[in-house]
């Protein structure tokens, strides 16, 4: 991919001298890759990042390293191999999540209340899968918001910082076009009210979000 791009840019440089900076950058990236390193570990300025992003290079994409451990070690913080994976991930500016696939498989067959008791018995506050999902959302700059009604409660995934009209558009394009305002509440606050919007409204926790 890089070699083709460099060749094409070199040909076009005769007509556009401003492409020289791009060629120099891609040459630098090519040398970096030949040393066996990932592009995401390179130090790049904002302009260079924008250029590289357009290349769709696999080793520039954000990653999370997942360390699979045994059930006996899932609650321990002293696993030598997890430490090594975490140290390697940090060289790329990446995160590391520890899970026990065996435990996750067992929990998949349990009801929600049974899962909580299962985790308590193991001395774990949060499942590895939940940690991985949260880390993935953070890495991709995503959040979820919930809509609730008589038929169902549903989660919608949006990019962090998305405005209310565009968030509504995730449900249906008509909602974005005709958006006036939405009533919202933080999830934790709603849970504190026992899931009751009436109680939340009485406590002044409902916010009205306009455009």
Where do the model's predicted regions map?
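C-terminal-of-GTPase-core extension/linker across diverse P-loop GTPases
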Residues: 3-211
């Amino acid at each position: 991919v890089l070699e083709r791009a460099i060749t094409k840019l070199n040909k076009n440089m005769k007509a556009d001298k401003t492409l020289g900076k791009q060629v120099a950058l891609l040459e630098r990236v090519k040398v970096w890759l030949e040393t066996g390193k990932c592009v995401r570990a390179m130090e790049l300025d904002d302009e260079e990042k924008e250029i590289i992003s357009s290349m769709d290079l696999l080793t520039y994409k954000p990653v999370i390293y997942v360390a699979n451990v045994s059930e006996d070690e899932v609650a321990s913080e002293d696993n030598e191999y997890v430490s090594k994976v975490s140290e390697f991930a940090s060289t790329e500016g990446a995160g590391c999540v520890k899970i026990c696939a065996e435990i996750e498989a067992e929990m998949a067959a349990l009801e929600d209340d049974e899962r909580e008791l299962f985790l308590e018995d193991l001395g774990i506050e949060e499942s590895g899968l939940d940690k991985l999902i949260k880390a993935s959302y953070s890495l991709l700059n995503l959040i979820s918001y919930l809509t609730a009604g008589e038929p169902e409660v549903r989660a919608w995934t949006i990019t962090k910082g998305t405005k209310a009209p565009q968030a509504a558009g995730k449900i249906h394009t008509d909602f974005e076009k005709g958006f006036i305002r939405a009533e919202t509440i933080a999830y934790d606050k709603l849970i504190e009210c026992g899931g009751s919007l009436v109680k939340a409204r009485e406590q002044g926790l409902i916010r009205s979000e306009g455009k």
